[in-house]
Amino acid sequence: LNAQIAVADARIAAFAKDDPIATRLTTAPGVGPVTASAFVAAIDDITRFRTAHELEAYLGLIPCERSSGEKRQLGHITKAGNGRMRWLLVEAAWTILRSKSPDTAALRAWSLQIAQRRGKRIAVVALARRLAGILYAMWRDDVVYDAHRIRPRLQAAPPRAA
């Protein structure tokens, strides 16, 4: 079994190395050959999505909404779409949180701020959604990951009106 796993890993790594999109996506933090290859296979054509939000919805990473009148309540993620891709993005988010690299500092700080308010598991899923948006932009704009382009919302949220 270990030999078969090694062969499969080698094939995935070879695909990621040969595919220019997958190679570019592996420059993002937490994204290795398996996640990049799976993302390319799951999405196929990035032009199907006009915005990163559409891609995040396709992957089931956006919260479901229950609205009534002017009251808007966000719930758990929808879990629509490819569950394995969603799982890979969540695992990549955990990798980012554990990383001490300066390239991940802004993403970690943003996620930890959410964790203080909502809990670590919700923060990890939010980071996975953010990572999906980053991968979308990298693919769409044909660029490699640049930590300086990440603009986290680190300022404190304004107090809510009662």
Task: List each model region and its residues.
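A detector of single, family-specific signature residues
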Residues: L1-A162
